[in-house]
Amino acid sequence: MRTLWIVAVCLMGVEGHLTQFGDMINKKTGTFGLLSYVYYGCYCGLGGKGKPQDATDRCCFVHDCCYGTVNGCDPKLSTYSYSFQNGDIVCGDDDPCLRAVCECDRVAAICFGENMNTYDTKYMLHSLFDCMEESEKC
């Protein structure tokens, strides 16, 4: 519980994109958004290496790969526009870079929702020492 409190305090100052991504995750999973995924497995959170631990972690791996294809803005800092329409996430930017970032986040949030049955608390706050296998290519 103390660890979740520390993570929550660290995220309180987060503006823009991470807040938006967390909102998408919350809507698609009914969880606490980023708090549920920030240090999950080998790929959720900052960085990533090794082999994804399960389908949920693979969502983060694919998300990292998606960010790697974005050109023209910083995916982790860019603020984009989106809405929820009939339960679907709709990205609304005309700017191609912002739209691409939104699409990466949209696909990841949907992936989390579709793979909630693989979410395993043993991978929360997962040590990167357990992620030493050779990383897959995007």
Swiss-Prot record:
Ca(2+) binds at residues 43, 45, 47, 64. Its cofactor is Ca(2+). Its main location: secreted. Residues 1-16 form the signal peptide. This is Acidic phospholipase A2 VP7. Expressed by the venom gland. Gene3D superfamilies: Phospholipase A2 domain (1.20.90.10). CDD domains: PLA2c (cd00125). It is found in: Secreted. Disulfide bonds join 42-131, 44-60, 59-111, 65-138, 66-104, 73-97, 91-102. InterPro entries: PLipase_A2, PLipase_A2_Asp_AS, PLipase_A2_dom, PLipase_A2_dom_sf, PLipase_A2_His_AS. Does not form a complex. It catalyses: a 1,2-diacyl-sn-glycero-3-phosphocholine + H2O = a 1-acyl-sn-glycero-3-phosphocholine + a fatty acid + H(+). Snake venom phospholipase A2 (PLA2) that is not toxic by itself, but the synergistical mixture of a basic and this acidic protein is lethal. PLA2 catalyzes the calcium-dependent hydrolysis of the 2-acyl groups in 3-sn-phosphoglycerides. Belongs to the phospholipase A2 family. Group II subfamily. D49 sub-subfamily. Binds 1 Ca(2+) ion. GO terms for cellular component: extracellular region. SUPFAM superfamilies: Phospholipase A2, PLA2 (SSF48619). The lineage of its organism: Eukaryota, Metazoa, Chordata, Craniata, Vertebrata. PANTHER family: BASIC PHOSPHOLIPASE A2 PA-11-LIKE, PHOSPHOLIPASE A2 FAMILY MEMBER. GO terms for biological process: arachidonate secretion; lipid catabolic process; phospholipid metabolic process. Its EC number is 3.1.1.4.
